[in-house]
Regions:
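Helix N-cap / beta->alpha transition motif
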Residues: 1, 12-14, 95-108
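Surface-exposed turn/loop modules enriched in turn-prone residues
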Residues: 1-17, 27-28, 165-180
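Surface-exposed, short loops/turns at beta-strand junctions within beta-sandwich domains
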Residues: 15-19, 201-204
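Short beta-strand segments enriched for Tyr within beta-sheet-rich domains
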Residues: 21-26, 136
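Aromatic, loop-rich ligand-recognition surfaces of beta-strand-rich domains
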Residues: 31-57, 102-183, 189-231
């Protein structure tokens, strides 16, 4: 690493798993090197700190056995993440993740994440397409509400936001009808994880897409699942 600040330090990982899965990268302390920490967390990743202690607090349990799970703490990096970049380009957030049947992280993230909304030429969209036209009567969408949040019911415990930033805020659903996109559903100021849109008039279409207009704070659109049903 060359002397100086604000630079990237590249290194190769010799690990090549047989199938996509989570990876744990341990960065050990070095008095001559510092890592940058961003002011926001990154979906699909966790940043933990080594506490050096493997025993749970005595007042929490009747026993004091060594527990490796308490060795790594998330609290020091709550709502933050170490700055890093990966290459080549990952498919961990590819569009097909929104139709793989998983609603929670398992062996990796299971959601579609768009490119950043800021500066984009057009609103990001997620499209479903069939070999032949279908009659669509209901669309169900599951957005990301980030399961990695420290939330309890004590009144003094507050988050820096009132609505989960990762939730999509404004969006519309369009169907390809007679050679053009037709809006069949629209939502404003969304703050829910799961949305169900029952169409007043079922529509015949071979293509359907979810167009994200804004989020509640996240730089990108994040969609866990989208399902389409007949009337």
């Amino acid at each position: 690493v060359a002397r100086g600040s604000g630079q990237w330090a590249a290194f190769r990982l010799p690990w090549r798993p047989g199938q996509p899965q989570n990876a744990f990268v341990i960065v050990k302390a070095n008095p001559s090197v510092h890592v940058y920490v961003s002011d926001r967390s990154h979906t699909g990743t966790l940043t933990l700190a080594d506490t050096g202690e493997t025993r749970a607090a005595k007042q929490l349990e009747d026993h004091d056995a060594s527990q490796l799970v308490v060795k790594w703490a998330a609290k020091p990096f709550q709502y933050r993440s170490v700055c890093f970049a990966v290459g080549p380009e990952t498919r961990a957030f590819a569009p097909d993740k929104a139709t793989d049947g998983w609603l929670r992280p398992y062996g990796g993230p299971h959601m579609w994440v768009s490119e950043p909304l800021a500066g984009a030429a057009q609103s990001p969209w997620l499209q479903l397409e069939w070999d032949r036209e279908q009659t669509v009567g209901e669309i169900r969408i599951v957005f990301n509400d980030d399961v990695n949040k420290d939330l309890i019911n004590l009144h003094h415990h507050r988050t820096p936001f009132e609505i989960m930033p990762e939730l999509v805020k404004d969006y519309r659903i369009e169907a390809w009808v007679d050679g053009q996109w037709e809006v069949v559903a629209r939502e404003r100021d969304n703050r829910k994880r799961r949305r169900v849109h029952r169409l007043r008039r079922p529509v015949r279409t071979g293509r359907l897409r979810l167009v994200v207009e804004s989020t509640n704070g996240s730089p990108a659109a994040e969609v866990v699942e989208i399902r389409v049903y007949a009337p």
